[in-house]
Amino acid sequence: MLSDELESKPELLVQFVQNTSIPLGQGLVESEAKDITCLSLLPVTEASECSRLMLPDDTPNHTNSSKEVPSSAVLRSLQVNVGPDGEETRAQTVQKSPEFLSTPESPSLLQDLQPSDSTSFILLNLTRAGLGSSAEHLVFVQDEADDSGNDFLSSESTDSSIPWFLRVQELAHDSLIAATRAQLAKNAKTSSNGENVHLGSGDGQPKDSGPLPQMEKKLKCTVEGCDRTFVWPAHFKYHLKTHRNDRSFICPAAGCGKSFYVLQRLKVHMRTHNGEKPFVCPESNCGKQFTTAGNLKNHLRIHTGEKPFLCEAQGCGRSFAEYSSLRKHLVVHSGEKPHQCQVCGKTFSQSGSRNVHMRKHHLQMGAAGSQEQEPAAEPLMGSSLLEEASVTSKNLVSMNSQPSLGGESLNLPNTNSILGVDDEVLAEGSPRPLSSVPDVTHHLVTMQSGRQSYELLNQGDLTERRT
């Protein structure tokens, strides 16, 4: 952890190692620890206290006792000034504690730091008391990347007379280089083996993060007869659901009942019910809205004129703005005709061609049949049906006698049994022409009802004979 003094001036610090455990060398670890105060290289107030830490003895010739040094005297030993160009300059203060300077047991920690030296800050954060264990944490902060100012290091770097904090800084520098090289090697190995797999978001699609490296498709479908391979685990999982027909996400709307493999597809489908269209065309004077980003992308090709989907059939060369249009077009080259006319049975490769055929032929035939039926329906609604010998109807079941005769209602049997006509008689609204009824010779039938009797002759005339 960083002390409060370091947090007060973050602009002076560049973290050298982030919470990295750096074990000290065996040459720096002594069996006996020395009790001195922590030395802060940043000026702080008088009230601040530095925690007491256990430091190893610098040399084996030192005694096993140490004198406690007041922290305020050490804090005044350095003054740090930040220049206008961001460079740091250090100057020793004129006033120094005589007790600190006159102590023979205390190591000369700041003896090698001169005002002209462009050295870097050394920030020691000792989480436990003492440096005798390799598990103790050291956090080093260095604000300069230029090593040209380290001229105070003597050629005999392994000499025990070098201050201990300089040896610790050297160990930290070497450890950082080794850790950086190890991390770079690990990243290179990961990218080459294709282990850096990123999963997509809710629809199962990976996020677009620039050009992807060429990775081997290791995920192979285990279903018999399917040889598809995948890179992304989300795609592979979605593909396996298509084999199992695992449509576990069902639309809750009443009367819909559609099901989907993934939840994202269901969410997109729900926009068709609630009318939500969040994707708007940005072109001027257009403003069309769409439920999905894919539909908007396909629509924008109308404005740009882009047709990226090209038919690869020999001699075709047609291109389309949408992949679905290309897929429909490929049926033409395959010779398959799945769309059949329900009236005449003719088949077509495209549903649009079938619809054009039905509007052109079958609707005209229906209109012509209705026009032929209208003139023939007029005599049915006009005069009596008995005046036409060739016209009979199932609706003619009863007829009333004249009121002047005072007779009752005369119920006639079905005219089909009387005239011998089959069931293929014309009803009102039938498209068949009325002239298609065959002319059948009828016999005389006498019917009596009360005081009157009627006769149906061959000629179809109705005669009345009083009794």
Curated annotation (Swiss-Prot):
Zn(2+) 2 binds at C251, C256, H269, H273. A zinc finger (C2H2-type) spans 219-243, 249-273, 279-303, 309-333, 339-362. O-glycosylated. O-GlcNAcylation may occur in response to increasing glucose levels and affect transcription factor activity. Zn(2+) 5 binds at C341, C344, H357, H361. Pfam families: zf-C2H2. GO terms for molecular function: DNA-binding transcription factor activity; RNA polymerase II cis-regulatory region sequence-specific DNA binding; transcription coregulator activity; zinc ion binding. Zn(2+) 4 binds at C311, C316, H329, H333. Zn(2+) 1 binds at C221, C226, H239, H243. Keywords: Activator, Chromosome, DNA-binding, Glycoprotein, Metal-binding, Nucleus, Repeat, Transcription, Transcription regulation, Ubl conjugation, Zinc, Zinc-finger. It is found in: Nucleus; Chromosome. GO terms for biological process: negative regulation of gene expression; positive regulation of transcription by RNA polymerase II; regulation of transcription by RNA polymerase II. The five zinc finger domains are necessary and sufficient to bind to DNA. Transcription factor that binds to the sequence motif 5'-CATCCCATAATA-3', and is specifically required to silence expression of fetal hemoglobin in adult erythroid cells. Prevents expression of fetal hemoglobin genes HBG1 and HBG2 through CHD4: acts as a direct transcriptional activator of CHD4, a central component of the NuRD complex that represses transcription of fetal hemoglobin genes HBG1 and HBG2 in erythroid cells. May also activate transcription of matrix-remodeling genes such as MMP1 during fibroblast senescence. This is Zinc finger protein 410. It comes from Bos taurus. The lineage of its organism: Eukaryota, Metazoa, Chordata, Craniata, Vertebrata.
